């Protein structure tokens, strides 16, 4: 099947084209709505690139240029030649709890729950509508970040607020990074030569946004992110878990509005708020130069991560493996070392030489004597979206 995967942002469209599960092209439309917009399409098979720089006013114009570049490259005759298009959607809300083919109801529901993800869902919706207009005969599939966590039990996803807030306003823990957690846990099963229904793993997706997921027999039973992607770990610019009483205190102290506090927690906090950097390469360079705030930021990040992983050891009946994925999880050997050292009493024994090796691809970095496997698995959310899209189209 010929599958296009779209990840539409407010001013960008990222895309990958798969032909029979093989990536043939990838690219980006950036700076939509600006005069110096740019479209890049790369032929993955021969590294040939095709580019256009021009004014792109909206997503529709951007996708039209992508179609032109597909034709110019010879990779795809036309968007109408696709078998399907998979769209990454951050939030499905309470009703869209599973990946699904797009119809009028799905469009309306994605729009309705945009209040939960105002920075993401409206852009995703624009991407779907643009694709429907550009290629009316092509099936569109909505792939929700929240869907993998639909198997969490109610006692894990509920907040201890008056029940009406859940019943009438859908306030509950949803979880995110679901596509990534699903992909790497499935790959872990292959790596360990087990069926995923027999495997219990803890997946740590560590990037500028970060979350941990407890996966029992292939299903999410708990995760660190909640109603929004702000809850949980200390992140690049997000604070993670916080005493809620701090918010009105800060509001009175600084005279900040709810919107300003929201911006503070999402964009000015995390490791960035502590030391002024959110790139871990910069943080570790600063630590080497004696920057105490950088050291504190890294220690806070790792400590919170250890607490969550440790708590999921308690949640799972048995833990077979810990998975590190995402930009930090895949590339930062120091973070992996600091986390695993603090978890040694739970049966985790890291092989320090394997951990330090700069190797891309899936690998096991635990010592042979370790009771729990430690895996580094590069995530591939686009491949997972393409797989699910193909599966749903095949069923229908």
Curated annotation (Swiss-Prot):
GO terms for biological process: acetate metabolic process; acetyl-CoA biosynthetic process. Its cofactor is Mg(2+); Mn(2+). Mg(2+) binds at residues 7, 381. NCBIfam families: ackA. Belongs to the acetokinase family. Homodimer. This is Acetate kinase. The gene is ackA.
